[in-house]
């Protein structure tokens, strides 16, 4: 019998601003059985995909991406905010509702043709994961799928992803 992970996602009304229903995953992370179930679910999905790496988007993508990579026996590659990686990087700028942001990756993190899954905790508007996929394409990596614990369907992230494959364990 599989565990209902929605029981471990807490809804926080009016956080961080009035009108927002924040999905708090800390109860899931704090429960070893639930956290393991989430990682195992991803691992079963990607076990036979001939992946070279799991790529995690800063910061909560690291929480799910690193243990998934270990479970699959492959490497973990971080995509970070600007100025956080010590070696030579490539980056991509992307638009937010008010302004822009930037993601970076080490320029030697992957080889052309490497098959990867991009992991983050939540798919909202899709801007960050689209930028991450664009960054990986610059390195010549093949993004097999973008994986999320949660998708907030009402924010239109799946439309922003277009034809890029993605998967979410929980949808709201």
From Swiss-Prot:
Annotated GO biological process: adenine salvage; AMP salvage; purine ribonucleoside salvage
Leading EC class: transferase
InterPro entries referenced in this protein's UniProt entry, alphabetically: Ade_phspho_trans (IPR005764), PRibTrfase_dom (IPR000836), PRTase-like (IPR029057), UPRTase/APRTase (IPR050054)
Pathway: Purine metabolism; AMP biosynthesis via salvage pathway; AMP from adenine: step 1/1
Gene Ontology MF, one: adenine binding
Reactions this protein catalyses: AMP + diphosphate = 5-phospho-alpha-D-ribose 1-diphosphate + adenine
UniProt EC number: 2.4.2.7
GO cellular component, one term: cytoplasm
Gene3D superfamilies: 3.40.50.2020
Keyword Plastid among record annotations: no
Chief location: cytoplasm
Annotated Pfam families: Pribosyltran
Protein's cellular compartments: Cytoplasm
Alphabetic keyword roster: Cytoplasm, Glycosyltransferase, Purine salvage, Transferase
Subunit record text: Homodimer.
Record function comment: Catalyzes a salvage reaction resulting in the formation of AMP, that is energically less costly than de novo synthesis.
Cross-referenced HAMAP family: Aden_phosphoribosyltr (MF_00004)
Family from the record: Belongs to the purine/pyrimidine phosphoribosyltransferase family.
Family matches, as PANTHER family: ADENINE PHOSPHORIBOSYLTRANSFERASE (PTHR32315:SF3)
Protein name, as recorded: Adenine phosphoribosyltransferase
Annotated source species: Herpetosiphon aurantiacus (strain ATCC 23779 / DSM 785 / 114-95)
